[in-house]
Amino acid sequence: FIEQEHFSQLMNILRRLDGGQRLTDDDVLWLRTEGKDYFSETFQEAFHAREAAFFAGEYRRTSDPWNAVNASSHYRKCRQAQEAHDLLTSIPAQRQNASKLRSAIATTHGGVMRDLGHLESALNFGTQAHALTPKDFRPCTLLGAVNFELGNYDIGQDWYAKAAERGASERSIDQDLRSILLHADQVKWEEIKAFLLRDDPVRYSWVSNLHPHKSTSKGKSRDKPN
C-alpha cells in the first residue's frame, strides 16, 4: 500500500530507475528514511544493479580502479558476487600502487570471496588488507566476520574488538553478527548464539529474538559489505 502523499515521488523514482537512470542522493535518502517502507529487497537490488553498471562503465571509460571497487561493492548488494570477482581480478597490478587503494581492493575482494563461500581466500585477502592499512577498521570487520563463519569465534571476536578500536560502530558490528546468524545452519546458529550470550549477555540480548533462517544463497551479499 502506498500512502497518497508518497505516490507521486515513489512513481517518479520507479520510472527513472526502470528507464535505466541513476537515482539522486536525495532519492536514496528519501528511500532510506521517509520512504523506507517501499525500499524492498527487490527494489534495493535493482538500485544496486544500476549503480554497479554505472561504476563498471566508469571503470571501462577511465581505468580508475576506485570505480571498479565501487562497482564491486554494489555488485555484492545485488547478488552478483561473481561479476565483482571478475571485475576486481581485471585490475592491472601496475594500477594498484597506493596502499589505501590496494587495501580497498583486497578488502572488497575478500568480501566477494566470502559471498562466494571461499572463506580461506577471504581470510587471505583480509590479512593482506590489514597489513596494508593497519589503522583501518574495514579489514578488521572482514576478518571478524570470516573467522565467525569458519567457527573461530574467539579470534573473530578479537578482530571485531580491533575494528571497534579503529572506529567501527557497535551497531555495524552487531549488524554483521546478525547477518552471519541469519545465514548460518542450525548447528552453527546454536554455537554462535551460545558464544555471544556467554561473552556479553546484555549487549547480545537481541540474539534471543532472532530465529534461524534455513535458506542461503551463494553469491548473495550479506547486509554489510565486508
Question: Can you name each region flagged by the protein language model?
Answer:
Residues 4-39, 60-77, 100-111, 174-176:
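Amphipathic alpha-helical repeat scaffolds of TPR domains
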Residues 48, 55-56, 88, 126, ...:
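Hydrophobic/aromatic packing residues within the alpha-helices of TPR/SEL1-like helical repeat arrays
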Residues 50, 83, 121, 155, ...:
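Alpha-helical positions within canonical tetratricopeptide repeat
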Residues 51-62, 91-100:
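Flexible helix-coil transition and linker loops at the boundaries of alpha-helical arrays
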Residues 62, 88, 94-96, 133, ...:
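Alpha-helical junction/boundary sensor with strong preference for TPR arrays
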Residues 68-133, 138, 142, 149:
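Alpha-helical adaptor scaffolds
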Residues 96-102, 135-140, 165-178, 203-209:
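Boundary/linker segments of alpha-helical solenoid repeat arrays
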Residues 148, 153-171, 178-185, 192-203:
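TPR/TPR-like (Sel1-like) alpha-helical repeat modules
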